[in-house]
Design a protein with these regions (language model features):
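Bacterial N-terminal signal peptides
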Residues: 10-20
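Short sequence/structural segments immediately N-terminal
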Residues: 2-6, 21-159
């Protein structure tokens, strides 16, 4: 192998490692993070904090329990470093659903979940309630997964 070819191969390999590092750097998930979206102009409650590492390691939650595709199919095979869309990218309306007025038809589940806050609440609260029931059944003690506004939104309502 010529010296030029050798230098080219080594340079290509080194550059590939740098490119991989740059691509993966922005896709690692933090251990905990606030469930915030810049799309919200105003908030009624302080942002909830997700303890991602705790959910995965302690509670053994798999990816598909929270993450799903556009058809609601669980994404169970997410790998570390993969880009994952934020909820707001599909659940595009940055608010809770409007209060139903007398005579108006009830929203379908699909229509309701277009509202970002409704989709998040469905995802988190349903799972937390199931978890708490399981703990109660197995131990006789109340489960600690939060299901009320003030437990998930520290400080509660924004004044």
């Amino acid at each position: 192998m010529s010296k030029k070819t050798f230098i080219f191969v080594v340079t290509t390999v080194v550059m590939s490692f740098f490119a991989a590092a740059v691509l993966l750097a922005g896709t690692t998930v933090q251990d905990t993070f606030k469930m915030e979206s810049k799309e919200y102009k105003t908030r009624k409650y302080n942002s909830a904090t997700l303890t991602h590492k705790k959910h995965v390691e302690e509670y053994k939650a798999n990816c598909g329990e929270c993450h799903h595709d556009a058809n609601g199919k669980p994404l169970n095979d997410i790998k570390t470093g993969e880009n994952v869309q934020k909820c707001i990218e599909c659940h595009k309306i940055p608010s809770r659903k409007p209060k139903k007025k007398k005579g108006e038809p009830k929203l379908t589940d699909e229509q309701r979940r277009a509202y970002h806050a409704e989709a998040l609440h469905d995802n988190c609260k349903v799972c937390h309630k199931v978890f708490n029931k399981k703990v109660k059944k197995e131990t006789g003690k109340k489960g600690k997964a939060p299901t009320s506004c003030n437990k998930c939104h520290p400080g509660g309502k924004i004044k």
